[in-house]
């Protein structure tokens, strides 16, 4: 078959790809990725539609090829060639070149998966660096959408016929809203979009292109409605609880967050009652279930942080901070906010248990959007934080450690190469949870953050350093969400024969792991010295 339209597509015209490779990649994308974000019109997945796809929607086609080609680990040059072209197209959009709704769709797809070919440097240990790229791609998508007046489709149309005319634009704009909210929640930034969102009375009938055409087709319209409702809850929680450092800190110290958190918990439970039994494919439903559990964690974790803030504000000057915090959290059941603290821990464990037991790593997790990998890491880091403050019992610690190990195994199985997100973040979890401290590792005594006033906020907004280079804890920080800080912490072990900190073995018997400074090299000294560790090797954050 001759593809006259496809022949004009730059990558085919210049010999980087053949029509057969393009068709194969488009089909692989449809089979593996499309179900998680069905932005590409279904008509483009037929082989006869490749010509029109290449002529009309070159941005969208290139985004599809960029994402799918990342799986061709034996032919990395294909992904590199497509990524270079994708980079040129994105630069063109940023420079104001003519484009249509398909460019917005392409940017949204890139933000969901962030193919490695678009980044200059990929570290072996994941540090959340994909979030920066996603943040920029979503921002460009929103600004382009505003320029194309996609926001006008946020309101219900007069008739079903009008709804069909603007269906593609409306779905693209609705996904701009979803992506904006979810990436902002991940990185703790304000929303890009403050205009009308898609929550102005829209329902499944407003997305006719997502509705099933034949028996057995996936009802993407219903799935997307559930996602919209959940995103609105994420948005509300972020706006009210995490809206700003000053207001959040005041709310923590005054304790007037209880009503908000209780109301949010009720709303989240109602979402579960409405959508918990949605009829769809299991690998799609599990993404909704995992998002629900992460929302529970995100909501309840605010109270956990508030209790830490209140405890620090009441600490006596002559009492060590670590001892004071462990004493406060030694009996969570007696605390007025116990239900929230237990709820956050339970949600984190539920999320990780779902990943370990209900997600096929090679058939499904491998192709899921990046946020589910990051939700996994956030949940694991949160549990590490809970352990640091003595919230977990000895039995819970052992169970959580086993669960983390299972998640590491699942993440690795999902990876096709060391550059895959699963492999990189599995390494981060391994460094954080599983590495025992060897004899000869130096010990840097903990400094009380309350004792110093010359600390500064780092560029990440979550780590404070004093004049001596030690990390300082601030009750207003939410650094269980700061993977760059976690990456900095574990980077004290860049080589296989070095250990960044004490793991579970040292936690159980810290007396066996007293350090000797003279055996530690300069690089490890430089890295570890920036962080506070207690005798159990716990990071204070």
Model regions: which residues?
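Short, basic/glycine-rich phosphate-binding loops at helix/coil junctions
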Residues: 5, 60-67
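Intrinsically disordered, low-complexity regulatory regions with latent secondary structure
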Residues: 2, 6-8, 12, 405-457, ...
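Long, low-complexity intrinsically disordered regions enriched in Pro/Ser/Thr and acidic residues
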Residues: 205-207
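The first (N-terminal) embedded transmembrane alpha-helix
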Residues: 33-36, 109
């Amino acid at each position: 078959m001759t593809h006259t339209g496809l022949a004009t597509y730059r990558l085919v015209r210049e010999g980087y790809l053949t029509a057969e490779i393009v068709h194969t990649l488009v089909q692989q994308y449809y089979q593996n990725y499309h179900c998680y974000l069905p932005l590409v019109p279904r008509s483009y997945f037929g082989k006869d539609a490749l010509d029109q796809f290449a002529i009309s929607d070159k941005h969208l086609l290139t985004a599809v090829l960029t994402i799918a080609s990342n799986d061709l680990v034996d032919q990395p040059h294909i992904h590199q060639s497509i990524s270079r072209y994708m980079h040129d197209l994105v630069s063109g959009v940023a420079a104001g070149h003519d484009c249509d709704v398909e460019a917005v769709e392409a940017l949204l797809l890139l933000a969901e998966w962030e193919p490695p070919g678009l980044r200059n440097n990929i570290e072996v240990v994941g540090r959340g660096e994909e979030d920066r790229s996603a943040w920029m791609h979503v921002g460009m998508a929103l600004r382009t959408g505003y320029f194309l007046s996609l926001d006008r489709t946020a309101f219900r149309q007069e008739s079903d016929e009008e709804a069909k005319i603007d269906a593609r634009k409306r779905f693209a704009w609705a996904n701009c809203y979803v992506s904006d909210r979810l990436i902002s929640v991940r990185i703790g930034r304000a929303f890009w979009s403050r205009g009308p969102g898609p929550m102005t009375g829209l329902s499944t009938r407003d997305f006719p292109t997502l509705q099933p055409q034949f028996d057995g087709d996936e009802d993407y319209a219903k799935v997307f409605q559930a996602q919209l409702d959940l995103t609105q809850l994420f948005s509300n929680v972020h706006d009210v609880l995490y809206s700003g450092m000053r207001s959040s800190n005041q709310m923590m110290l005054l304790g007037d967050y209880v009503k908000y958190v209780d109301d949010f918990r009720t709303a989240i439970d109602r979402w579960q009652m409405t959508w918990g039994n949605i009829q769809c494919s299991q690998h799609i439903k599990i993404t909704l279930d995992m998002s629900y559990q992460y929302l529970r964690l995100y909501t309840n974790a605010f109270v956990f942080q508030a209790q830490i803030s209140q405890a620090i504000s009441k600490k006596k000057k002559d009492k060590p901070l670590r001892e004071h915090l462990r004493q406060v959290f030694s009996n969570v059941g007696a605390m007025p906010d116990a239900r929230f603290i237990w709820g956050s821990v339970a949600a984190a464990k539920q999320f990780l248990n779902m990943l370990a037991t209900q997600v096929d790593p090679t058939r499904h997790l491998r192709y899921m959007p990046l946020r589910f990998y990051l939700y996994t890491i956030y949940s694991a880091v949160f549990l590490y934080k809970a352990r640091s403050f003595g919230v977990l019992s000895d039995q819970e610690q052992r169970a959580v450690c086993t669960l983390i190990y299972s998640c590491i195994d699942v993440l690795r199985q999902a990876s096709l190469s060391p550059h895959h997100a699963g492999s990189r973040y599995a390494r981060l979890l391994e460094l954080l949870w599983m590495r025992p401290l060897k004899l000869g590792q130096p010990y840097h005594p903990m400094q009380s953050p309350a004792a110093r006033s010359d600390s500064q906020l780092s560029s990440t907004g979550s780590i404070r350093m004093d004049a001596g280079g030690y990390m300082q804890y601030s009750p207003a920080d939410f650094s269980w969400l700061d993977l760059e800080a976690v990456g900095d912490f574990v980077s004290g072990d860049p080589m296989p024969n070095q250990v960044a900190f004490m793991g579970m073995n040292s936690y159980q018997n810290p007396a066996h792991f007293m350090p000797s400074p003279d055996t530690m090299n300069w690089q490890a000294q430089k890295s570890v010295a920036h962080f506070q560790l207690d005798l159990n090797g716990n990071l204070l954050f």
